[in-house]
């Protein structure tokens, strides 16, 4: 197969081995963090004594907070999530240490061990702070999807990803190893795959899974065969029905609330996919991911990848990353407190049980290590939170920008000083600042003094603060981890806990430095490599990459900022 990807230069092996020694130092955000009860920290697994597994199965559930895993634990299947919770090792206090917790940032961290301050993946999309031009995290106009339409700013390559991953290091040292990334979202497939892997993502226009010409000129036969079967069409007319009796959902918010959005399938169960449509087509395919069937379809493609690529079939370790996107779509529309989210989680658990049974039979229980985490958590829907007596709400971006511009006009003269938002940051009319003979930092500081007066805003940090060394101001270290000079906005704004930017009184989101968004599952299983137990010690998701590298007997990615996870000895 002719490959068209550009060459990705990795450091020489000896340099990488030397860099690996630096990964044992704790990151700045974990140093001094709350630790486990004295005497409860498990011994580090002696990975060097165990032969590397044939396959690493890296699972991501997009938008899954740990509170949902533990809150519904009593309703789980015996061998889905409970495989990790009852027979694996899992971390009760696993956090992201960066402040802007969104999908691309989370996926960029997991297998690189590097924060956005190093990777350059500061968000899903951002605007150039000098020109305001939009940039998507994995957009690259030089490449297109294979056999599918490529929209402007579609994710097609890891060009913007400035670091290497565990898979990149593995494939440099062992070219026969394979690194496959699969997801309902382009960013969920591309970023974990790194620069040397191969990514496949769901195409909402066709119901297919496709790669891009960054990776290959044409799909392998197994991908064509999967798509030829039109597996997405099987869900047309299928009913999403609750898995359990109504009484089992008493702990979650009922369907049909006024703040719950219509994801394309309504906001009540049971829901029939494709209702009111004549047949499968782009509109229908786009409604699959906001349902449990999006995960079912993604896992079906993952099985096809295991078969087609013969993953885990020889002594060259392979890595399969599968990012399941449906939970994020469902939480955005209905909220993590909703029955729809609760029920989707139970469907997902059943899918995982079937998936692991398949891997046990195909690869062998003693031949693979499984890891499951999330790219971020979720904030409860503000309207529901307020009904529970909590402080919560929405900050309308246009109103916040208008308020700040009015204040800056009074101070510096008429002008559209703030031209918009990039993530939760403000970007400015830089030529106007220069024309008026003003210093940038003077304008940024003035804007900060104004924006903190907006209802729902907790604080804001200027470029000078983010480039500084202050380690005492709350949330500053987290936002510094999310800030990349020349890419990120020069004024970063943080809403209060429970608040979010948004102009629609519907649905909810994530993206804050608070526990709801940063506290995620970190679950591991692998009988020959990992012991069992709940670990209380606080850890960060940046610790995953060095740990997986140790299991694989390869150096950690050279930009990794984490340390080895304190996994219990086997």
Please report, for each region that a protein language model flagged, where it lies by residue.
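Active-site His/acidic residue clusters
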Residues: 190-199, 273-286, 290, 310-348, ...
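Bacterial signal peptide processing site
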Residues: 21-23
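C-terminal motif of bacterial Sec signal peptides marking the signal peptidase cleavage site
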Residues: 16-19
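Secreted, luminal/periplasmic, and some membrane-associated catalytic domains
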Residues: 61, 124-155, 163, 193-195, ...
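Substrate-binding rim/cap in mid-to-C-terminal beta-strand-loop elements of soluble/periplasmic
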Residues: 387, 395-438, 509-552, 566-570
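Active-site nucleophile/metal-coordination loop of metallo-enzymes that catalyze phosphate/sulfate
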Residues: 38-52, 66-164, 171, 185-205
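Non-catalytic, well-ordered alpha-helical segments in soluble enzyme domains
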Residues: 82-86, 163-172, 423-461, 527, ...
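A long, amphipathic alpha-helix that forms part
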Residues: 68, 288-314, 327-368, 444-446, ...
């Amino acid at each position: 197969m002719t490959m068209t990807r550009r060459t990705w230069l990795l450091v020489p092996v000896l340099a990488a081995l030397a860099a690996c020694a630096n990964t044992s130092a704790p990151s700045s955000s974990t140093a001094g963090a709350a630790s486990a009860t004295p005497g409860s920290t498990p011994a580090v697994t002696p990975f060097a004594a165990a032969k590397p597994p044939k396959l690493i199965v890296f699972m991501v559930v997009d938008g899954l907070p740990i509170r949902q895993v533990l809150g519904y634990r009593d309703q789980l299947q015996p061998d889905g999530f409970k495989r990790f919770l009852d027979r694996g090792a899992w971390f009760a206090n696993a956090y992201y240490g960066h402040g802007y917790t969104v999908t691309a940032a989370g996926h960029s961290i997991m297998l690189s061990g590097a924060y956005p301050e190093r990777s350059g993946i500061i968000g899903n999309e951002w605007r150039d702070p000098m020109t305001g031009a939009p940039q998507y995290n994995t957009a690259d106009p030089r490449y297109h999807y294979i056999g599918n339409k490529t929209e402007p700013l579609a994710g097609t390559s890891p060009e913007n990803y400035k670091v290497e991953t565990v898979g990149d290091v593995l494939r440099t040292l062992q070219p026969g190893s394979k690194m496959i990334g699969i997801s309902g979202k382009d960013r969920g497939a591309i970023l974990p795959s790194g620069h040397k892997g191969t990514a496949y993502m769901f195409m909402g226009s066709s119901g297919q899974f496709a790669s891009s010409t960054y990776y290959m000129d044409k799909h392998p036969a197994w991908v064509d065969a999967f798509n030829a079967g039109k597996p997405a069409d099987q869900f047309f007319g299928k009913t999403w029905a609750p898995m359990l009796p109504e009484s089992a959902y008493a702990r979650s918010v009922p369907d049909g609330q006024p703040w719950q959005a219509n994801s394309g399938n309504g906001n009540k169960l049971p829901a029939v996919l494709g209702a009111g449509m004549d047949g499968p087509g782009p509109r229908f395919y786009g409604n699959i991911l906001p349902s449990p069937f999006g995960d079912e379809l993604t896992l079906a493609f993952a099985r096809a990848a295991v078969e087609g690529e013969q993953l885990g079939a020889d002594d060259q370790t392979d890595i399969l990353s599968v990012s399941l996107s449906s939970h994020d779509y469902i939480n955005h529309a209905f909220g993590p407190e909703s029955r729809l989210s609760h029920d989707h989680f139970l469907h997902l658990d059943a899918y995982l049980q079937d998936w692991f049974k398949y891997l046990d039979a195909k690869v062998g229980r003693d031949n693979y290590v499984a890891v499951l985490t999330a790219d971020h958590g979720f904030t409860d829907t503000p309207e529901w939170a307020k009904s529970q007596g909590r402080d919560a709400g929405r900050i309308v971006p246009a109103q916040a920008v208008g308020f700040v511009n009015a204040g800056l006009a009074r101070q510096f003269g008429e002008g559209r000083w703030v031209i918009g938002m990039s993530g939760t940051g403000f970007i400015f009319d830089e030529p106007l600042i220069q024309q008026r003979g003003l210093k940038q930092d003077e304008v940024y500081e003035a804007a900060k003094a104004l924006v903190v007066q907006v209802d729902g805003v907790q604080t804001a940090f200027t470029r000078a603060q983010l480039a500084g060394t202050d380690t005492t101001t709350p949330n500053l270290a987290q936002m510094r981890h999310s800030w990349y000079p020349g890419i990120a906005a020069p004024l970063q704004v943080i809403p209060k806990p429970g608040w979010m930017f948004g102009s629609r009184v519907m649905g909810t989101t994530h993206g804050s430095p608070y526990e709801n968004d940063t506290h995620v599952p970190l679950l591991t299983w692998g009988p020959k490599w990992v012991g069992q137990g709940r670990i209380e010690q606080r850890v960060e998701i940046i610790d995953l990459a060095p740990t997986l590298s140790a299991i694989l007997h390869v150096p950690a990615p050279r930009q990794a900022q984490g340390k080895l996870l304190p996994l219990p000895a086997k």
